[in-house]
Swiss-Prot record:
It comes from the Bacteria. This is H(+)/Cl(-) exchange transporter ClcA. Residues 107-114, 175-187, 191-199, 385-399, 400-402, 403-414, 415-419 dip into the membrane without crossing it. Belongs to the chloride channel (TC 2.A.49) family. ClcA subfamily. It comes from Vibrio parahaemolyticus serotype O3:K6 (strain RIMD 2210633). The gene is clcA. The chain crosses the membrane at residues 31-67, 75-98, 122-139, 146-164, 213-230, 251-279, 286-307, 328-347, 353-374, 420-436. The record marks E146 as: Mediates proton transfer from the outer aqueous phase to the interior of the protein.
Length: 467
């Protein structure tokens, strides 16, 4: 043995065999927490980005099949119904069979986990949410990928703490929140919104400390870097770059916010009604649940052919609306139609979120409001597109009750940084009116409903997790 080998052996003899594990698992070490937060953010970025690509692949493949092989064998409408029904069936089956907590957006589950009242079975949630979401969103249903990405990001955070055997409760909590922030940052290419979503919307559950906030920031940054490395650095929504509106028009944004505040409260209540209605239909019976979901998927396959504006998450619809190709009456009809389709899809328990559908609704009503104001007040030089962007943030703020997140989210998604003042006015107006009307934030409402109506599952899951 050489002298160098003896020195190396002597050094290694004093190093614990699981040195890395011990270093990272010491929850009291701030540096180790930040390292794990970077790992969580990176993994959440990959999961969120490839989830988006997977959904896009399924949608494109479905379209190609309709144009070629299947479309030439069966009538086009029948082929569209069958393909979308099959995709929806896959999503509903995976959820009901393997991970019921993966139904819906999943954000209430993460909030419940941060309060230690819901488990995180990441080994089930990650594959079910990923592949189930591919099926449900790929079928053309009005669902967003943002909620699922937040839940999968949180699941990644819990996975990392389990892999490194982290015992410290505060560290586990911080990394769970970090994963949620990373998931949203990757879903919207919006790191600031991802950070603020955890700090603002999850404020009842989030344990504020310097290390936890730093962990959330690092995770969001890493997730966004991964997203941009794969998808590029362009904004998620390509829209015109608007200038700040005239000061004499700002009162219109306050009025728009008030209208969204009223609608946000009504919309949240309608979501609960829709969920309860679907439960009354299928009564948690798997066959009824799958049949209902498949029929719903087939209907949206048909709508994809004839009224595509009423299908999908709505991100692609937003820039189309701001081109000015739709009349005010058509915008109102599309708004009403998408309210109905959003309630049907999200209320059914499909593995999909409601972020993107809400942004589309805000755009439709906001643009219709701006176009109407332009007709009624021609001397004010009103740009309807500015009201469309303000509407995106206002409906989010009214329903989620997170105005700062809504402002940052819209700005980052559209790159319209000059519109921060009208966004602030509209979002704050929406939140104030919603609070005055006594409405609950949507995710708190959904979590409360889950805890109330699903107590048996809540008691069983920790046993399954422990096993």
């Amino acid at each position: 043995m050489t002298k160098r080998e003896r020195i190396v052996k002597s050094v290694l003899a004093h190093v614990p065999k699981d040195a890395i594990n011990q270093f990272v698992s010491r929850g009291s070490t701030p540096f180790s927490v930040l390292i794990m937060a970077a790992i969580v953010g990176t993994l959440a970025g990959f999961v969120g980005t490839y989830f988006e690509l997977a959904v896009h692949f399924v949608s494109e493949t479905r379209t190609e099949w309709l144009r070629s092989e299947i479309g030439s064998v069966l009538p086009l409408w029948l082929a569209a119904v069958l393909i979308s029904a099959l995709l929806a069936f896959i999503g509903y089956f995976l959820v009901h069979r393997f991970a019921p907590e993966a139904a819906g957006s999943g954000i209430p589950e993460i909030e419940g986990a941060m309060d230690n009242i819901r488990p995180v079975r990441w080994w089930r949630v990650l594959p079910v949410k990923f592949f189930g979401g591919m099926g449900a969103l790929g079928s053309g249903m009005v669902l967003g990928r943002e909620g699922p990405t937040v839940q999968m990001g949180g699941a990644v955070g819990r996975m990392v703490t389990d892999i490194f055997r982290v015992k410290d409760d505060d560290t586990r909590h911080s990394l769970l929140a970090s994963g949620a922030a990373g998931g949203l940052a990757a879903a919207f290419n919006a790191p600031l919104a991802g950070i603020m979503f955890v700090v603002e919307e999850m404020r009842p559950q989030f344990r504020y400390s310097l290390i936890s906030i730093r962990a959330v920031i690092i995770s969001a940054i890493m997730a966004n870097i991964v997203f941009r490395a794969i998808n590029g650095q362009d904004a998620v929504i390509t829209m015109p770059q608007y200038q700040s509106p005239a000061l004499q028009t700002l009162w219109l944004f306050l009025l728009l916010g008030a209208l969204f505040g009223v609608f946000g409260v009504i919309f949240n209540k309608l979501i609960t009604v829709a969920q309860d209605s679907f439960v009354a239909i299928h009564k948690n019976d798997r066959k009824r649940y799958l049949i209902t979901g498949s029929i719903l998927g087939g209907v949206f396959g048909l709508l994809l052919l004839y009224v595509p504006q009423l299908t999908g998450g709505g991100i692609a619809l937003i820039p189309d609306v701001t081109t000015g190709n739709y009349s005010i009456s058509i915008l109102v009809l599309l708004f009403i139609g998408r309210v109905v389709t959003t309630l049907l899809c999200f209320g059914s328990g499909a593995p999909g979120g409601i972020f993107a559908p809400m942004l589309a609704l805000g755009t439709l009503f906001g643009y219709a409001f701006g176009a109407s104001a332009d007709v009624l007040l021609p001397t004010l030089d009103i740009e309807p597109g500015v009201f469309a962007i303000a509407g995106m943030g206002a409906l989010f703020a009214a329903t989620v009750r997170a105005p700062i997140t809504g402002i940052l989210l819209v700005i980052e998604m559209t790159n319209n940084y000059y519109l921060i003042l009208p966004l602030i006015i509209t979002c704050l107006g929406a939140v104030i009116v919603a609070q005055l009307l006594g409405g609950q934030p949507i995710y708190s409402q959904l979590l409360h409903r889950t805890l109330k109506n699903d107590k048996l599952r809540q008691q069983d899951l920790p046993e399954n997790q422990a096993s």
